[in-house]
């Protein structure tokens, strides 16, 4: 770790950069332009590296942040009730390479959405961001974007991906606006030239907090480079660890404002601290009340993507119309959902709760089943979601509910701890046959993680002396989400890996 100072992304999957001939879409880890990029079988471009030219001033490092799911209270939360959101073990990974001082460029590459661009550091609008009335400190609390600063970065956003279709350009510009606003707010004209490369295992546009995960990665990477974070280290007290993650969370929220305009702050909070939160918003002119569940246990989860397109706005409007037609009845349903959320948080926060106990997990699972039934009564399920429940119930594997807005999207299944592996495999094969995407994940895991330097020890013969260095070429060549997770994942194939470190926020 660096010494401490004492004082997408919403997007499209599968697109790739086509290059526009402007000299800013082809980058190497030396920060220089390069041609002759080759394409692998998936259509994703690979960089040609020139390691001798890079002369990095600091070792490459990585940060990683999780996605999230709503576990209890979707839809009722829109009507002023409480909900619980928790981290999942699907994550985004950001690789940071510091370049030689002579390069004076900063490059952003989000490989999974085909975004790649390089800016000259001196050409960025530092004058606007460095004004005494505008300049922020790393510990500042920023609750709204400055219109003057937003305007100042627009010319540097507009030059990105000019030859891409408009829909893809919007995605790229959203990501770039978040990065540039953070980079210019926290950095200075003397900031070291760098290459920021992102890969993610979180499905995009599925309500799983992919953009917040990216925002947390960007904020934490910049704060680490500024040496404004303490830790993470094993002996750090929980209250100090929470202070560090809150510092990251504040700037991740700024990034989310760039992407979404008026975010709730829930997604970035979960992605930063991990575990889970209870959140409630009774007044939409004010931020929600967010209460961390610091000791939320890790729970085994099967996440299933129905691959059924859905519209959050449409599903929310359906419930609002139903409430208008049957106010007493729908209010009773919403009140019941609120009681389910309260019961779940009380149960999970009990000191005697055992996440390995079938009895305790059954209680949580029963609450999930009740919550789903109430959502069905509001008309926000879908035959594809009900089919998942049918398959899971038939095999007796766990307890399933929809997560998010419904009408398609994803379901979550809390897995029984005693379910035979062959039974789970049979279910997963059936899901694949019926065109579902499934992810075995963990609910309530760690938040932001740091790998400094970018070296992992897997405890295998493949390890080089001192561990396996994760260089940019390996990172970009990892095939799909499984390849990324196997190469740099917190757990990989062999359980907890030596290298990744987390701020320990638990009370115990």
Swiss-Prot record:
Pfam families: GHMP_kinases_C, GHMP_kinases_N. It comes from the Eukaryota. InterPro entries: GHMP_kinase_C_dom, GHMP_kinase_C_sf, GHMP_kinase_N_dom, GHMP_knse_ATP-bd_CS, Mev_gal_kin, Ribosomal_Su5_D2-typ_SF, Ribsml_uS5_D2-typ_fold_subgr. It comes from Gibberella zeae (strain ATCC MYA-4620 / CBS 123657 / FGSC 9075 / NRRL 31084 / PH-1). Its EC number is 2.7.1.36. The keyword Magnesium applies. GO terms for molecular function: ATP binding; metal ion binding; mevalonate kinase activity. This is Mevalonate kinase ERG12. GO terms for cellular component: cytosol. Its cofactor is Mg(2+). Residues 10-42 have a biased composition (Low complexity). Keywords: ATP-binding, Cytoplasm, Kinase, Lipid biosynthesis, Lipid metabolism, Magnesium, Metal-binding, Nucleotide-binding, Steroid biosynthesis, Steroid metabolism, Sterol biosynthesis, Sterol metabolism, Transferase. GO terms for biological process: ergosterol biosynthetic process; isopentenyl diphosphate biosynthetic process, mevalonate pathway. The active site is at 267 (proton acceptor). NCBIfam families: mevalon_kin. Mevalonate kinase; part of the second module of ergosterol biosynthesis pathway that includes the middle steps of the pathway. ERG12 converts mevalonate into 5-phosphomevalonate. The second module is carried out in the vacuole and involves the formation of farnesyl diphosphate, which is also an important intermediate in the biosynthesis of ubiquinone, dolichol, heme and prenylated proteins. Activity by the mevalonate kinase ERG12 (FG05912) first converts mevalonate into 5-phosphomevalonate. The keyword Ligase does not apply. Belongs to the GHMP kinase family. Mevalonate kinase subfamily. It is an enzyme of class 2 (transferase). Its main location: cytoplasm. It is found in: Cytoplasm, Cytosol.
């Amino acid at each position: 770790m660096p010494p401490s100072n004492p004082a997408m992304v919403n997007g499209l999957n599968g697109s790739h950069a086509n290059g526009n001939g402007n000299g800013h879409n082809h980058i190497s880890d030396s920060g220089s332009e390069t041609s002759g990029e080759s394409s692998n079988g998936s259509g994703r471009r690979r960089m040609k590296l020139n390691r001798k030219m890079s002369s990095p001033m600091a070792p490459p490092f990585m940060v990683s942040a999780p996605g999230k799911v709503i576990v209890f209270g979707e839809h009722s939360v829109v009507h002023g009730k409480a909900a619980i959101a928790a981290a999942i073990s699907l994550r985004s990974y950001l690789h940071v390479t510091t370049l030689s001082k002579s390069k004076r460029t900063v490059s952003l590459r989000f490989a999974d959405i085909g975004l790649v661009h390089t800016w000259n550091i001196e050409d960025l609008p530092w004058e606007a961001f460095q004004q005494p009335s505008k300049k922020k400190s790393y510990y500042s609390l920023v609750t709204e974007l400055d219109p003057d600063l937003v305007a100042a970065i627009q010319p540097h956003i507009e030059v990105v991906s000019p030859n891409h279709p408009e829909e893809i350009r919007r995605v790229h510009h959203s990501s770039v606006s978040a990065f540039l606003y953070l980079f210019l707010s926290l950095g200075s004209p003397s900031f070291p030239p760098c290459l920021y490369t992102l890969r993610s295992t979180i499905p995009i546009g599925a309500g799983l907090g992919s953009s917040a995960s990216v925002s947390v990665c960007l904020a934490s990477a910049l704060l680490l480079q500024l040496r404004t974070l303490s830790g993470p280290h094993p002996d750090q007290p929980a209250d100090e660890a929470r202070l560090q993650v809150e510092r990251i969370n504040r700037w991740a929220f700024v990034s989310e404002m760039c992407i979404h305009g008026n975010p709730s702050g829930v997604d970035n909070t979960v992605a930063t601290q991990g575990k889970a939160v209870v959140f409630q918003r009774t007044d939409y002119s004010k931020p929600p009340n967010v209460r961390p569940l610091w000791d939320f246990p890790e729970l085994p989860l099967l996440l299933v993507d129905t691959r059924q397109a859905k519209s959050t706005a449409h599903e929310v409007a359906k419930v609002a119309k139903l409430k208008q037609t049957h106010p007493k009845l729908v209010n009773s349903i919403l009140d019941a959902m609120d009681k389910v959320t309260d019961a779940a948080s009380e149960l999970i926060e009990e000191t005697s709760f055992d996440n390995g106990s079938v009895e305790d997990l059954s209680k949580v699972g029963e609450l999930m089943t009740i919550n789903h039934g109430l959502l069905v009564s509001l008309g926000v399920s879908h035959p594809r979601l009900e089919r998942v429940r049918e398959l899971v119930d038939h095999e007796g594997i766990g307890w399933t509910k929809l997560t998010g807005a419904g009408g398609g999207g994803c379901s979550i299944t809390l897995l029984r701890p005693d379910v035979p592996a062959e039974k789970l495999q049979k279910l997963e094969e059936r899901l694949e046959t019926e065109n579902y995407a499934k992810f075995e994940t963990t609910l309530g895991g760690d938040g932001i993680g740091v790998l400094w330097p970018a070296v992992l020890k897997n405890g295998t013969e493949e390890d080089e002396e001192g561990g396996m260095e994760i260089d940019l070429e390996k990172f970009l060549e990892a095939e799909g989400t499984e390849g990324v997770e196997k190469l740099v994942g917190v757990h990989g194939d062999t359980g907890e890996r030596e290298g990744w470190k987390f701020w320990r926020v638990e009370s115990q």
